[in-house]
Amino acid sequence: MCLGIPGQVVEVGKTITENALVDVCGVKREVNIALVCEGEPDTMIGKWVLVHVGFAMSIVNEQEAQETLNALMAMGEVEDDVSAFLYGEESTAKRA
């Protein structure tokens, strides 16, 4: 099963071959946007994408992104693996 985590593109490189910075629950992650970028990379700033293993796999609207994040946060309250992915590896250490 693949799990796509919603994040908002906050910074991009000059070309789509450069990674973008995507905000996932306050954690900035480097993400490759080449699969979803149609045109200039700066048009991606502010868009929500589903991220899987460092790649933006699709563009989603903000409502869908927020609903998915809310569901994942609820899962993270009982599943350390989900929480670690959303908030970074150190989150499980803090909870232990």
Curated annotation (Swiss-Prot):
Alphabetized GO MF terms: carbon dioxide binding; iron ion binding
Family per record: Belongs to the HupF/HypC family.
Ranges in coiled-coil conformation: none
Gene Ontology terms describing biological process: protein maturation
PROSITE patterns named among the record's database cross-references: HUPF_HYPC
Record-linked Pfam families: HupF_HypC (PF01455)
Record-given protein name: Frd operon uncharacterized protein C
Top-rank taxon, per record: Bacteria
